[in-house]
Amino acid sequence: MRIAILGGTYNPVHIGHIFLAKEIEYLLNIDRVIFIPTCNPAHKLIDENVSVSNRIDMLKLALENEDKMFIDDCDIINGGITYTVDTISCVKKKYKNDKLFLIIGDDLFQNFDSWKDPQSIVSSVELVVAHRIYKERLKSSFKHIYIDNKIIPISSSEIRNRIVNGLPVSYLLPFGVLKYIKDNNLYVKKVNV
């Protein structure tokens, strides 16, 4: 089986994530896309008002009608700071005989050499770089594949900011995720009394 790994905070998951997963399915002939929500990413802070279970619930809602997309909670179970090399080790134990593709955006790829044990990563999986912010292909000494995906100019941080500022986000999120955010009062300004 050909399996793509998409790690991220998914805070919240949005249509850009799902669109990229669909592009990956098509462009790389992928049998399964595994979304891996990070526990505590090494290079990013997560809003403390949104729990791990909130993020997983939103992912479940976003993927409920997708037959090739699944969630793996290995980073959540392992806890602590999340490093990609450790995530891959966990995934490889479950999918021993499958071909694994690690998908990262070019925004992350530009600093890939500073990641924990990048050589081990490229030795374990096919590193696939997706356009996220750059139209041109970045160069690197690390073995990688670039896909010519469409750039969807959206980010979870932009969505959170729009919600805080009372701006519409309905066209940026799967319906179930939008409803969950509203029902659970996520990402809104907390008023101190």
UniProtKB/Swiss-Prot annotation:
Q: Which CDD domains match?
A: NMNAT
- What metabolic or biological pathway is this protein involved in? Cofactor biosynthesis; NAD(+) biosynthesis; deamido-NAD(+) from nicotinate D-ribonucleotide: step 1/1
The UniProt entry, under InterPro entries, shows: Cyt_trans-like, NadD/NMNAT, Rossmann-like_a/b/a_fold
Its EC number(s): 2.7.7.18
Where are its TM segments located?
A: none
Keyword terms of this UniProt record? ATP-binding, NAD, Nucleotide-binding, Nucleotidyltransferase, Pyridine nucleotide biosynthesis, Transferase
Q: Which SUPFAM superfamilies match?
A: Nucleotidylyl transferase (SSF52374)
Enzyme type, top EC level: transferase
Set out the biological process GO terms recorded for this chain's protein: NAD biosynthetic process
Q: Which Pfam families match?
A: CTP_transf_like
Q: Which GO terms describe its molecular function?
A: ATP binding; nicotinate-nucleotide adenylyltransferase activity
The lineage's top-level taxon is: Bacteria
Reaction it catalyzes: nicotinate beta-D-ribonucleotide + ATP + H(+) = deamido-NAD(+) + diphosphate
Q: Which family does it belong to?
A: Belongs to the NadD family.
Write out the function statement from the record. Answer: Catalyzes the reversible adenylation of nicotinate mononucleotide (NaMN) to nicotinic acid adenine dinucleotide (NaAD).
Which PANTHER family does the entry link to?
NICOTINATE-NUCLEOTIDE ADENYLYLTRANSFERASE-RELATED, PHOSPHOPANTETHEINE ADENYLYLTRANSFERASE
Q: What is this protein called?
A: Probable nicotinate-nucleotide adenylyltransferase
Can you name the source organism?
Answer: Borreliella burgdorferi (strain ATCC 35210 / DSM 4680 / CIP 102532 / B31) (Borrelia burgdorferi)
This protein's gene is called: nadD
